[in-house]
Amino acid sequence: MKQIAFIGLGHMGAPMATNLLKAGYLLNVFDLVQSAVDGLVAAGASAARSARDAVQGADVVISMLPASQHVEGLYLDDDGLLAHIAPGTLVLECSTIAPTSARKIHAAARERGLAMLDAPVSGGTAGAAAGTLTFMVGGDAEALEKARPLFEAMGRNIFHAGPDGAGQVAKVCNNQLLAVLMIGTAEAMALGVANGLEAKVLAEIMRRSSGGNWALEVYNPWPGVMENAPASRDYSGGFMAQLMAKDLGLAQEAAQASASSTPMGSLALSLYRLLLKQGYAERDFSVVQKLFDPTQGQ
């Protein structure tokens, strides 16, 4: 049975690690938050004293951290993990980071004889808990096949996006589109209600018409339209607005690097930055509804 080092047990990492335990894998886990470690230990994992300790004897290293600087620090610092992971180890980096950062870590890992994949995920905390995540994978196809059983223990859809960094490119493209669709849905909902339509009726009309999209299907931003959506619990839980702003920033970095025109992505980033200034950083990203009707969700 493979020994897995899992580093980063936040809202996404913890349920992903739990599903690996359920699949029978042996886990050595580390997080800076002790309560997160304790929860995994209670589920059957072993606790490491440090990230460096976690990777000792590991066949696979999985990391799930907040941002590029954390991931680069973990692997590339003077005493970073790449200096302590045994050659031949498979490294799965599942955080959402800049494609340039992913490529930098890929190159450093390859120099040390490590097989690495950038494998950001989509599906949110619910998908992480249910084991239905989508993995967007960048890197060597042979390494992906070795990692496939692990991905299948945590997710439902596994896509090989392309070479080093391609998983991260796919992720920022997806999340930019998600933000634009959510903003458009929120704007349309506010317009219709302001002109006398009942919110649930309007939502159903649009859902079944050419404007239909994921937000209208399962994540409507108008409170009360969908009982289980974050909008109906004061925008708590879900995918925080500050994380969407981070991902939109990564998309803009990629756009600048490739001289791509992304006016909608740029506007979306401006709107989410405005939400952060208004104090909604830790609310679900569907809280963008408040920019179009500030009375909603109060």
UniProtKB/Swiss-Prot annotation:
Keywords assigned by UniProt, alphabetized: Branched-chain amino acid catabolism, NAD, Nucleotide-binding, Oxidoreductase
Alphabetical GO biological process terms: branched-chain amino acid catabolic process; L-serine catabolic process; protein homotetramerization
Pathway: Amino-acid degradation
Gene3D superfamilies cross-referenced by the UniProt entry: N-(1-d-carboxylethyl)-l-norvaline Dehydrogenase, domain 2 (1.10.1040.10), NAD(P)-binding Rossmann-like Domain (3.40.50.720)
EC number(s) reported in the record: 1.1.1.387
Molecular function GO labels: 3-hydroxyisobutyrate dehydrogenase activity; NAD binding; NADP binding; oxidoreductase activity, acting on the CH-OH group of donors, NAD or NADP as acceptor
Protein name: NAD-dependent L-serine dehydrogenase
Organism listed in the record: Pseudomonas aeruginosa (strain ATCC 15692 / DSM 22644 / CIP 104116 / JCM 14847 / LMG 12228 / 1C / PRS 101 / PAO1)
Organism phylogeny: Bacteria, Pseudomonadati, Pseudomonadota, Gammaproteobacteria, Pseudomonadales
